[in-house]
A protein has these predicted regions:
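Interhelical loop/hinge segments that connect adjacent transmembrane helices in multipass membrane
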Residues: 8-17, 21, 156, 199-244, ...
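Helix-loop interface residues and adjacent transmembrane-helix termini in multi-pass membrane transporters
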Residues: 49-52, 88, 119-122, 152, ...
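Membrane-water interface segments that mark the loop-to-transmembrane alpha-helix transition
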Residues: 19-39, 60-61, 66-114, 127-133, ...
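Hydrophobic alpha-helical transmembrane segments
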Residues: 126-133, 161-206, 220-224, 231, ...
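Interfacial/gating helices of multi-pass transporter permease domains
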Residues: 42-69, 124-127, 220-224, 228, ...
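Residue-level signature of transmembrane alpha-helical cores of multipass secondary-active transporters
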Residues: 24-32, 62, 98, 131-132, ...
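Helix-loop junctions and terminal segments of transmembrane helices
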Residues: 70-88, 150-151, 261, 265-279
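Membrane-interface junctions at transmembrane-helix termini in multi-pass inner-membrane proteins
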Residues: 18, 22, 79-88, 138-161, ...
Length: 279
C-alpha cells in the first residue's frame, strides 16, 4: 500500500508540474505578446510626435540605466527563485540590499550627471539623467516582490501588472509628447512604468519588508547571483556599446535612428526569451 501511495504521489506531482508549466507558457506568451503589441502601437504614435534626436537623447542614457539595474538586482531575483523554500528573511535581505545599493549608485550618478552631459556634448543630459536614473532606484523597491511572484509562479498576476504598467506609462508618454514635452515624455514613460509595476507587485504579493536587516542570506546567495551579474553586464555592454560610441562621436539624430532600429530589431528575440523566462 505504501508503494502504491508513493507512486500516486509522484504521478500527482508530475501532473501538477505539467499543468503549472503549461499555464506558465500560456501567461508568458500573453505577457510577451501584449508587451510587443502595445509597444508597437504606442511606438508608432510616439514616433510621429517625437524626433530622432529625442530618441537619441534617451538612448545615450540606456547603457547607464541598464548597467545600474544589473548591479542593483545583482541576480538576486533568480537566486530567490533558485532557493527551494525561501524564507521571509531571504526576501527581506534581498530587499534592503537592493535598496541600499541602488541609493548609493543613484547618488554617484546624480553627481556624475554634469560629466555625462559634457562627455556627450548635450547640456540637457544633466537634469534629464538625474530624472531618468530615478527609474532604477524606484525599481529596487520591487525586486524582492518580483522574485516572490516568479518563485510562486504567479504568471497571471505578472502579466496583469505588466499590462497595467505598459498602458499607464505609454498613455502618459503619449499625452506629454502631444503637448510638446519631447524627450521628457520618454523619460516620464520609463519612470511611470517602473512605479506602476512596483505598485502592482506590492498589491498582488502582499509581502512587506521589515526593519530586521540581516545580510546573511544575501551572502549565501552571492555565489550564484554573481555569475548572473557578470553575464548580464557583459550582455548589456555588448548590446549598447555602439549607442554609447555613436552618442559621443555622431550627431544625435543618427543616435536616435540607430537606437530605434536596434529596438525594433530585437523585439522578436525578446518575445521568445521573455515567454520562456517567465516559467
Amino acid at each position: 500500500k505504501q508503494v502504491i501511495f508513493h507512486i500516486y504521489q509522484i504521478e500527482t506531482m508530475a501532473e501538477s508540474l505539467k499543468e503549472k508549466t503549461a499555464k506558465g507558457l500560456f501567461w508568458g506568451a500573453m505577457n510577451s505578446g501584449s508587451t510587443q503589441v502595445l509597444n508597437i502601437l504606442f511606438g508608432i504614435f510616439l514616433a510621429r510626435l517625437l524626433s530622432p534626436a529625442d530618441y537619441g537623447i534617451i538612448g545615450i542614457l540606456t547603457i547607464f540605466t541598464l548597467i545600474a539595474g544589473n548591479l542593483q538586482s545583482s541576480g538576486f531575483t533568480q537566486a530567490l527563485v533558485n532557493i527551494r523554500k525561501p524564507t521571509d528573511n531571504d526576501y527581506n535581505s534581498v530587499f534592503w540590499f537592493n535598496v541600499l545599493v541602488s541609493l548609493t549608485m543613484y547618488v554617484v550618478l546624480f553627481f556624475s550627471a554634469p560629466l555625462i552631459a559634457d562627455f556627450f556634448h548635450q547640456p540637457c543630459l544633466t537634469s534629464l539623467s538625474r530624472f531618468v536614473f530615478l527609474s532604477f532606484f524606484i525599481s529596487s523597491f520591487g525586486i524582492a516582490q518580483n522574485g516572490y511572484m516568479m518563485k510562486n509562479m504567479m504568471n497571471k498576476e505578472i502579466t496583469i501588472v505588466n499590462f497595467m504598467a505598459l498602458i499607464s506609462s505609454n498613455v502618459v508618454g503619449l499625452v506629454l509628447a502631444f503637448n510638446g514635452m519631447a524627450y521628457w515624455s520618454l523619460a516620464w514613460q520609463q519612470v511611470i512604468f517602473i512605479l506602476v509595476l512596483n505598485i502592482g507587485r506590492y498589491y498582488y504579493t502582499g509581502w512587506r519588508p521589515n526593519f530586521h536587516i540581516d545580510f546573511g542570506p544575501v551572502r549565501k546567495m552571492f555565489g550564484f547571483s554573481v555569475k548572473l551579474l557578470v553575464t548580464n553586464i557583459i550582455n548589456t555592454v555588448s548590446n549598447n556599446v555602439l549607442t554609447f560610441v555613436f552618442g559621443r562621436f555622431y550627431p544625435i539624430n543618427d543616435v536616435g535612428n540607430y537606437s530605434q532600429a536596434y529596438n525594433w530589431d530585437t523585439k522578436a528575440n525578446s518575445f521568445v526569451a521573455n515567454t520562456v523566462g517567465q516559467i
